[in-house]
A protein has these predicted regions:
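N-terminal Rossmann NAD(P)H-binding glycine-rich loop of SDR-like oxidoreductase domains
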Residues: 3-23
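N-terminal Rossmann-fold cofactor-binding loop
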Residues: 30-34, 49-50
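Rossmann-fold cofactor-recognition segment
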Residues: 41-52, 72-73
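NAD(P)-cofactor binding segment of oxidoreductase domains
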Residues: 63-110, 126-137
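Short-chain dehydrogenase/reductase
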Residues: 109-113, 117-133, 153, 163-171, ...
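Conserved beta-loop-beta element that borders a ligand/cofactor-binding pocket
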Residues: 133-163
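Substrate-positioning beta->alpha
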Residues: 165-173, 186-209, 216-217
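Mid/C-terminal beta-alpha module of Rossmann-like enzyme folds, strongest
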Residues: 207-268, 280, 285, 302, ...
Length: 342
């Protein structure tokens, strides 16, 4: 199989690239080359900016592919460009959408591909929905061979997955845990969530590549493991060998009090604060041997070990740390005041 990836060095795509090359497939990447250390050895690199359509078209002249995947398309305009570049050049075009596109607030915690798409809280999700609608129109009217993939919370060894963090990433929460500080958990920690290791995601995704039965379909790929946020944070604390000191704060308060640049209204109210259980029946029908095998407690131990042994992954976030302290202090003061007045 000859595949072309736009991107190819992110959390989701790295595991897919690695597995494809291990299995002997021919992989091409359109990549700006900003992270050369992350480029998989053995891949053919087209060093270009996908935003420069004329340059990319010239570099692709005479080429055709079995599969093209865009890992970095976020708007319908990106996909219109992809259609111009790749119609007639590929047998299948896979679009990475998002499970956050599903209806919020949910009418049913059980999620499958038939769940309506609507998210008034998050522009990111609305753009993904608009992208899906455009591609399905191109499939119906122009025969563009589209497959839409909806990941949920997919992680790798390079970052510990969490419910909330600042723009600096998750390390500051890990640091707070190691320092014995309280960490904020949205809600009361009992809502349900699913974490998927990127190597498991890769197995399902590769099973859709070149799969004629996946053309014109939308497919979600997640683990079948369902966890509460309390279980998630306890697993992280256990991996660190520390006690979890949780401070429970309502998602609405978090979203209202956090800087807008963190986009927690979208990330929480439009995604992680909702209880979800994913039904992967459709994926398993299309990819019969798909099974997610990395339990979260196993995957998070690998992530914690990697982060603690790689200083480049330890990005401190003083702004987020101060915000956590203020929120925790305000909640404790409010509770003390209510108790005193009662």
């Amino acid at each position: 199989m000859k595949a072309l990836f736009i991107g190819g060095t992110g959390t989701i795509s790295t595991a897919i690239s690695t597995k494809l090359l291990e299995d002997g497939h021919e992989l091409w990447l359109i990549n700006r080359g900003n992270r050369n250390t992350a480029l998989p050895p053995g891949a053919h690199i087209i060093q270009a900016d996908i935003g420069d359509e004329e340059d990319v078209s010239r570099r692709l002249e005479g080429q055709s592919f079995d599969v093209v995947v865009d890992f970095i398309a976020f708007t319908p305009q990106h996909l219109e460009r992809d259609y111009r570049l790749f119609h007639g050049r590929t047998k299948q075009f896979l679009y990475i959408s998002s499970a956050s596109a599903y209806q919020k607030p949910l009418s049913d915690y059980r999620i499958n591909e038939g769940t309506p798409l609507a998210n008034p809280y998050w522009e990111y999700s609305r753009n993904k929905i608009a992208g899906e609608e455009l591609l399905m129109k191109l499939y119906r009217e122009e025969g563009f061979p589209v497959t839409i993939v909806r990941p949920s919370h997919t992680y790798s060894e390079r970052s510990v997955p969490l419910g909330l963090h600042g723009t600096g990433g998750s390390y500051q929460v890990i640091k707070r845990m190691m320092e014995g500080k309280k960490v904020i958990i949205h809600g009361d920690g009992t809502s349900l969530w699913t974490m998927t290791h990127n190597t498991d995601f890769a197995k399902g995704f590769i099973g859709l590549m070149g799969n004629i039965h996946a053309i014109g379909e939308s497919v979600q790929i997640t683990s079948d493991e369902t966890l509460t946020w309390n279980q998630i944070y306890r697993a992280i604390a256990d991996a660190l060998g520390v006690e979890l000191r949780a401070c429970y704060v309502s998602s609405a308060f978090i979203a209202a009090s956090a800087p807008k640049s963190w986009d927690l209204r979208g990330a929480l109210l439009g995604d992680k604060s909702n209880s979800v259980v994913f039904d992967n029946t459709k994926l398993k029908r299309l990819v019969p041997d798909y099974t997610a095998t990395v339990r979260f407690d196993q995957g998070v131990r690998m992530a914690v070990d990697y982060v603690l042994n790689h200083p480049e992954c330890q990005r401190e976030d003083a702004e987020f740390d101060r915000w956590c302290d203020r929120v925790i202090e305000a909640q404790e003061e409010a509770l003390a005041k209510v108790r005193k007045e009662g």
